[in-house]
A protein has these predicted regions:
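Loop-to-transmembrane helix junctions at the membrane interface
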Residues: 75-89, 113-117
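Juxtamembrane boundary at the C-terminal end of a transmembrane helix
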Residues: 132-143
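Hydrophobic alpha-helical membrane segments
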Residues: 85-103, 123-130
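Membrane-helix boundary connector in multi-pass membrane proteins
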Residues: 98-119
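Physicochemical signature of membrane-embedded alpha-helices that form the seven-helix bundle of GPCRs
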Residues: 14-21, 53-60, 84-91, 119-122
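Hydrophobic transmembrane helix segments
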Residues: 21-53
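Core segments of alpha-helical transmembrane spans in multipass integral membrane proteins
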Residues: 24, 29, 51-73, 91-97
């Protein structure tokens, strides 16, 4: 019965899956930035002296994942009235997408042979997923 309640809180299984996929993406980057920092630096040819700032960046993902877990498992009303969180996540993804385009296609500061378009695609996908959530859960998050 509890699983059915969770599905209902998310307006159906589709939005619950989108929510889970989105925040699994956040958890993936949080883990890599905070706990696998050296591997992260090596993959993107970033000097290890940037580790503190990379972990700082990852901490924002951790905060969002913790709030998502709270909404999913603890918060009595689930997503109801959580418009601030969902809108903040969308705006963060949107700005990361545009900053990625600027950084990879326009400015090119710090480009190496390991530079890829991941800085555009990852936030672009996350932006689309968060937009789907804002739209699909609008009746609940704005109530």
């Amino acid at each position: 019965m509890e699983g059915i309640d969770m599905i209902e809180k998310f307006n159906g299984i589709i939005y619950l899956i989108v929510f889970i996929v989105h925040f699994l993406g956040y958890a993936f980057y949080a883990y890599r930035c905070v706990f696998k920092t050296q591997d992260f630096c090596d993959e993107y040819a970033v000097d290890h002296t940037a580790a503190i700032m990379i972990r700082f960046f990852g901490s924002f993902f951790i905060g969002s994942v913790l709030v998502a877990l709270y909404i999913m498992f603890i918060r009595p009303n689930g997503v109801e009235g959580a418009w601030g969180f969902f809108n903040l996540v969308f705006v963060q993804n949107l700005t990361a997408f545009f900053v990625g385009i600027y950084s990879i296609k326009i400015n090119k500061l710090g480009h190496t042979e390991k530079t890829s378009d991941e800085g555009i695609y990852a936030p672009g996908i996350l932006m689309i997923l968060s937009a789907i959530l804002c739209y699909g859960l609008a009746d609940k998050i704005y109530s």
